[in-house]
Amino acid sequence: MAEKHVKNMTKFERLTHQEFQRGFSLIEVLVALVILVIGLIGIFNLHIVAKRGSFESFQQTQASYYANDIINRMKLNRTRLANYSGDYTGELSKPSKGCDVAVGAVSLCSPAETEAWDLYQWEQSFIGAAETVDGQNVGGLDSPTACIDIDGNTVTVAVAWRGIREGAGTTYSGNECGKDDLGTRRRIFVVSTVII
């Protein structure tokens, strides 16, 4: 029946009918491309959000490691426990005597020398001094500040760093470590323990 309808059309009607059908398939292709592009943009945005979340998670894990590292060092040097208290930003100078057997220390260190070495090594670790590119530290935390508070045998270690964007972690009022330096992008990990 459709063929009869086309045969009964005038030449002008047939031409306009065919032209309409040719343009219609082009519009379908353009609509499909727009939908595809919108989908790809969504996938790229999802990838960026996942990368940010992965980086924030890695920083949180690193902060936990560094806090527990210094606590373990303090447990091994209990006689100097009160002297570990302070705020640390990576500005300690290298002690004159290295107390790490792994780097060739052959003589025993006093508790004071061990404390100085522990704090120096710990600071170098959380600022990422072991991993550098063109003189810049690329390991460790982003703009870290660490605070150790000691009240008798109770030790509180707070490690603060700069997050990728502003977040809910900035309003934590239980510890002020890094609050002034890191502003609204501050992230903080706090652990308390008792060393007997």
Model segments located where?
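Short N-terminal micro-motifs specific to bacterial/archaeal maturation
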Residues: H17-F20, V34, S54, E113
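C-terminal juxtamembrane segment of a hydrophobic transmembrane alpha-helix
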Residues: V34-S57, M74
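Intrinsic low-complexity/disordered segments
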Residues: R14-Q18, F44, Q59
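Short alpha-helix carrying the canonical HExxH Zn2+-binding catalytic motif
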Residues: I27, S64-A67
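Flexible, low-complexity segments enriched in proline/glycine/serine and punctuated by aromatic residues
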Residues: R52-T61, N68-I196
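N-terminal signal-anchor/signal peptide hydrophobic helix marking the start
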Residues: R22-V34
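N-terminal leader/signal peptides at the extreme start of proteins
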Residues: M1-F24
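Glutamine-centric residue-chemistry signal
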Residues: Q21, H47, Q60-Q62
